[in-house]
């Protein structure tokens, strides 16, 4: 433990005084100071000038990261008949209807993304209290309530990331693995920031993006210059 403590302290010292750096500098710093033996996720946290308690200030969207997330995404699909077959063929991990609803109600949630055909929403709607807090509730605004099940499953499996402003106006997500090339991480980060920028709600007042920070799963964070990250 002492050795890990020294590594963590060394990482914090390396980050000291580094603020509002470029995305490239932040990625290089994070990669050079990893102190654990597993492949950490590179995470982004964006503080936005919105209050998501107001409907006209909610920030929600989806972005396909150009280089994927490096994460294996487990996908569940609520569908029947031909659409259920389509979901299975597209690579969905779990496909069902009432049986899947009962599984979720029992507390067994073994998926990271949930997709549904429109006709299944009366069933899925009963699961709002379970799926909602986990940000798993299918929503047409992010393409997870759809008849094009094949495309939705492939997008989820291929590196598509959903985002939503949480309490305090913070949006956070994983944007790749530390093992990715620096250029690929930088590309993913700018794609994510660009998508959040385009999702600016009509009710947002004043500065929309207040702070952007990058970190690894176990490492300290570093703030990134907003104008450098938000390049159209």
UniProtKB/Swiss-Prot annotation:
Repressor keyword on record:
yes
GO biological process, alphabetically ordered: regulation of translation; translation
Record-linked Pfam families: Ribosomal_L1
InterPro entries recorded: Ribosom_uL1_bac-type, Ribosomal_uL1, Ribosomal_uL1-like, Ribosomal_uL1/biogenesis, Ribosomal_uL1_3-a/b-sand, Ribosomal_uL1_CS
**What is one term from the GO cellular component aspect held by the record?**
cytosolic large ribosomal subunit
Q: Answer whether the UniProt record assigns the keyword Ribosomal protein to this protein.
A: yes
MF terms per GO, please? Answer: rRNA binding; structural constituent of ribosome; tRNA binding
UniProt keyword list: Repressor, Ribonucleoprotein, Ribosomal protein, RNA-binding, rRNA-binding, Translation regulation, tRNA-binding
Per the record, the similarity remark reads:
Belongs to the universal ribosomal protein uL1 family.
The free-text function statement in the UniProt record for this protein reads: Binds directly to 23S rRNA. The L1 stalk is quite mobile in the ribosome, and is involved in E site tRNA release.
Q: What does the record note on quaternary structure?
A: Part of the 50S ribosomal subunit.
Protein name stated in the entry: Large ribosomal subunit protein uL1
Q: Which organism is it from?
A: Roseobacter denitrificans (strain ATCC 33942 / OCh 114)
């Amino acid at each position: 433990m002492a050795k890990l403590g020294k590594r963590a302290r060394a990482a914090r010292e390396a980050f000291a005084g580094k603020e509002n750096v470029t995305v490239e500098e932040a990625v290089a710093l994070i990669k050079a100071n990893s102190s654990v033996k597993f492949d950490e996720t590179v995470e982004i946290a964006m503080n936005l000038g919105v209050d998501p308690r107001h409907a006209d200030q909610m920030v929600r969207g989806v972005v396909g990261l150009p280089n994927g997330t490096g994460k294996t995404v487990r996908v569940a699909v609520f569908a029947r008949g031909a659409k259920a077959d389509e979901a299975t063929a597209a690579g969905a991990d779990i496909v069902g209807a009432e049986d899947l609803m009962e599984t979720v109600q029992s507390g067994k949630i073994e998926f990271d993304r949930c997709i549904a055909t429109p006709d299944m929403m009366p069933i899925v709607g009963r699961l709002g209290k379970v799926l909602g807090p986990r940000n798993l509730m299918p929503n047409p605004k992010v393409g997870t309530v759809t008849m094009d099940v094949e495309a939705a499953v492939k997008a989820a499996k291929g590196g598509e990331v959903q985002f939503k402003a949480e309490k305090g106006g913070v949006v956070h997500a994983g944007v790749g693995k530390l093992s990715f090339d620096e250029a690929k991480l930088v590309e993913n980060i700018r794609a994510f920031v660009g998508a959040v920028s385009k999702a600016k709600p009509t009710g947002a007042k004043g500065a929309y993006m207040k702070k952007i920070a990058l970190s690894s799963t176990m490492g300290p964070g570093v703030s990134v210059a907003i104008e450098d990250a938000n390049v159209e």
